[in-house]
Amino acid sequence: MSLSVEKKAAIVAEFGRDAKDTGSSEVQIALLTAQINHLQAHFAEHKKDHHGRRGLLRMVSRRRKLLDYLKRTDLAKYSETIARLGLRR
């Protein structure tokens, strides 16, 4: 259920400041969004996977906290990030 190395590298290259920038809020939010989207497809097929759903909710909560932090510290990057990821807010 995790992302491939190539997919992670592509996300880091798209949202990071350089190729090794994995710690910035924008990159972390983009990686979590990709994982969440992948898991949503999984739960469409496996409706009774409650243990996995708990992990999904944990990821959504972590993404929400990172988005709140980004909004508090840099509103322009927050707006750009949610627009690029297609998140509603």
From Swiss-Prot:
Keywords: Ribonucleoprotein, Ribosomal protein, RNA-binding, rRNA-binding. One of its GO terms (biological process) is translation. One of its GO terms (cellular component) is cytosolic small ribosomal subunit. One of its GO terms (molecular function) is rRNA binding. It comes from the Bacteria. InterPro entries: Ribosomal_uS15, Ribosomal_uS15_bac-type, uS15_NS1_RNA-bd_sf. It holds the Pfam family Ribosomal_S15. Belongs to the universal ribosomal protein uS15 family. HAMAP family: Ribosomal_uS15_B. Part of the 30S ribosomal subunit. Forms a bridge to the 50S subunit in the 70S ribosome, contacting the 23S rRNA. One of the primary rRNA binding proteins, it binds directly to 16S rRNA where it helps nucleate assembly of the platform of the 30S subunit by binding and bridging several RNA helices of the 16S rRNA. Forms an intersubunit bridge (bridge B4) with the 23S rRNA of the 50S subunit in the ribosome. This is Small ribosomal subunit protein uS15. The lineage of its organism: Bacteria, Pseudomonadati, Pseudomonadota, Gammaproteobacteria, Pasteurellales. The gene is rpsO.
